């Protein structure tokens, strides 16, 4: 697993203007779901543009261990021959998801609908993350889960339900992972499985279920929520999937281009699902020059080409209801806020505390060690932007790929270089990050 590797420190130095065109890797959320739904479908699923980072590769290995035929046919081109809903076989060994909470939690939902037993495990970071929020609804549906750790943490053994039950479930927090696990388990249950969320979370699972032939209905629920109803026991059919570029990965070169003066870059095929564009909305409110063109779509997911130019940013207040649409982007937004003029307040960030690290504390520490005034007030992050960042600090990444990439983006425009203690975990989501940024003009050493 990745956490057994030697640390790979790296320093980012003040760079000249960034220029060029790039395509960031395929979206991680779509890549996981394409593999899992391809494995649950009947027939062949061809996937192009799959993210070939460690997290997604571990999901591919897990689907193979569960009985699906999963093979790489070319550069980011994959083919899956599925086993059908409830058709998984008991794996011979534990399913190791490395650092991937998404792959692990979605696979738990998929396995919960098959009458098999599977053990789920991961690296030290994933073992520390809460799983009870996934386990609770799956147990209501008839699955049985045994964990030797407090809070239902990994490693755990999951026995899928022989006769899964449809449920109506209200998610305790806005979470696409909880919602998706319940819906994937609900594929094997007769009748209607319903998930109600008070704040709308990413809807990639719903869109892809429809693409594979499931009947799913989404309705508004309250001011910001959704009610999702799935008709169980469909025959999913294999379908082609084109994976758009990951907006969460595009966030790093995007913010780097905004804060490095004179930059002018283009990012192609970036997903523009409205439940993933909170960062772009916020950056534009801050005064960012971000233009989109060539808007199109595949499998229900829109994508576009973005032109991003160096901009003078101002502080803004980010409302808590925006969090689900940009939960993975707050770290790099904090970097933009540090270079802005004025105070930026990001509200309602409690979910950052249970990511690959406590990202709320880690973000504050990343800024403080580089001379930025920052405060945590409850679940709010307050950044005092001064138009520049002193830099000169060493950032502890805590085995978190997004902390590493955020800190490196910051170092490209800070007064003094910024060092990250370990870049190894960048490979989980963006293996080509450093060379791609160097092609745009970034200076690392």
From Swiss-Prot:
One Gene Ontology MF term: 3-phosphoshikimate 1-carboxyvinyltransferase activity
Chain positions recorded as phosphoenolpyruvate binding sites: 28, 101, 129, 177, 359, 402
UniProt region (Disordered), positions on chain: 1-25
InterPro entries: Enolpyruvate_Tfrase_dom, Enolpyruvate_Tfrase_sf, EPSP_synthase, EPSP_synthase_CS, RNA3'P_cycl/enolpyr_Trfase_a/b
Keywords: Amino-acid biosynthesis, Aromatic amino acid biosynthesis, Cytoplasm, Transferase
Record-listed 3-phosphoshikimate binding positions: 28-29, 33, 175, 177, 328, 355
Location of the protein in the cell: Cytoplasm
EC numbers for this chain: 2.5.1.19
GO cellular component terms, semicolon-separated: cytoplasm
Superkingdom assignment: Bacteria
GO biological process, one term: chorismate biosynthetic process
Family annotation (NCBIfam families): aroA
Family assignment from sequence similarity: Belongs to the EPSP synthase family.
Function comment: Catalyzes the transfer of the enolpyruvyl moiety of phosphoenolpyruvate (PEP) to the 5-hydroxyl of shikimate-3-phosphate (S3P) to produce enolpyruvyl shikimate-3-phosphate and inorganic phosphate.
Official protein name in the record: 3-phosphoshikimate 1-carboxyvinyltransferase
